[in-house]
Curated annotation (Swiss-Prot):
Family, per entry: Belongs to the universal ribosomal protein uL30 family.
GO BP term (any one): translation
Short name of any one Pfam family annotated for the protein: Ribosomal_L30
Disulfide bonds: none
GO molecular function: structural constituent of ribosome
Subunit architecture: Part of the 50S ribosomal subunit.
The protein, known as: Large ribosomal subunit protein uL30
Key word Repressor present: no
Entry keyword S-adenosyl-L-methionine: no
Keywords, comma-separated and alphabetical: Ribonucleoprotein, Ribosomal protein
GO cellular component: large ribosomal subunit
SUPFAM superfamilies in UniProt: Ribosomal protein L30p/L7e
Taxonomic lineage of the native organism: Bacteria, Pseudomonadati, Thermodesulfobacteriota, Desulfovibrionia, Desulfovibrionales
Length: 56
């Protein structure tokens, strides 16, 4: 399981990064979600790695 936490604001992100955060369900700063560890989730995290904090 992977825990993803939004630590930086979505303001100033490009539309693709915003859609990725929406797909991850992260809307507010300090919001956390837990996901299964798979390639799809890892790819989404890679697109917004500068905005999130990942814990395994």
């Amino acid at each position: 399981m992977i825990k993803v936490k939004l630590v930086r604001s979505r303001i100033g992100c490009n539309p693709n990064q915003r859609r990725t955060l929406d797909a991850l369900g992260l809307r507010k700063i300090r919001q956390e979600k837990t996901f299964e560890d798979n390639a799809v989730v890892r790819g989404m995290i890679a697109k917004v790695v500068h905005l999130v904090e990942v814990t395994e």
